[in-house]
């Protein structure tokens, strides 16, 4: 499932965040890549312990944990602290699949990368290229969203970032360990949850809503891992 979540941050918030990112000191993005990915990765990245990365990352996590669409789709158990990258001057990241497990800095905890996310901090008209290209069973999807918008997709997906030939593309990326590791099961639960919410608005007193909600929770109980 590939899901677009709009306006996680407002235009004013994005403007302030981008201004701060533009003034930050960036490092070579290869530092956080695996062996294979490092050969394909050509970008800049904020160090994980950078104060700005922590500040923006904490604000992102607060928004995400209170966002009904993200919660419904991701069913998050753990979220890896957001990382931040910059693509400019031909920077790109060739096709790769993210590492299955990521160590949170310091090695105190691990996160299984069931879901990947990118939050855009640059508007599409501010740079050329830089599309996030995601491959799934239905083909290739090119994603280039407005600043403040997020895309959520399975961590098992082959994906790349096209070269940025003009301007700069600022973004955050992170991974989520879901209560439900299998994408097809998460998709079914998401569609069921969205249908229940719509029916609750349309026919709030319908007696079948109780049974349908019970079925959702019984499936979640069967498939979830804690």
UniProtKB/Swiss-Prot annotation:
Residue ranges annotated for the Fe2OG dioxygenase domain, each copy included: 78-178
Keywords: Dioxygenase, Iron, Metal-binding, Oxidoreductase, Vitamin C
UniProt EC number: 1.14.11.-
Enzyme class, UniProt record, top EC level: oxidoreductase
SUPFAM superfamilies: Clavaminate synthase-like
GO-annotated biological processes: DNA damage response; intracellular iron ion homeostasis
Cofactor(s), names only, from the UniProt record: Fe(2+); L-ascorbate
Gene3D superfamilies per record: q2cbj1_9rhob like domain, Rabenosyn, Rab binding domain
Binding note for cofactor: Binds 1 Fe(2+) ion per subunit.
PANTHER family per UniProt: PKHD-TYPE HYDROXYLASE YBIX
UniProt protein name: PKHD-type hydroxylase PSPA7_5129
Origin species: Pseudomonas paraeruginosa (strain DSM 24068 / PA7) (Pseudomonas aeruginosa (strain PA7))
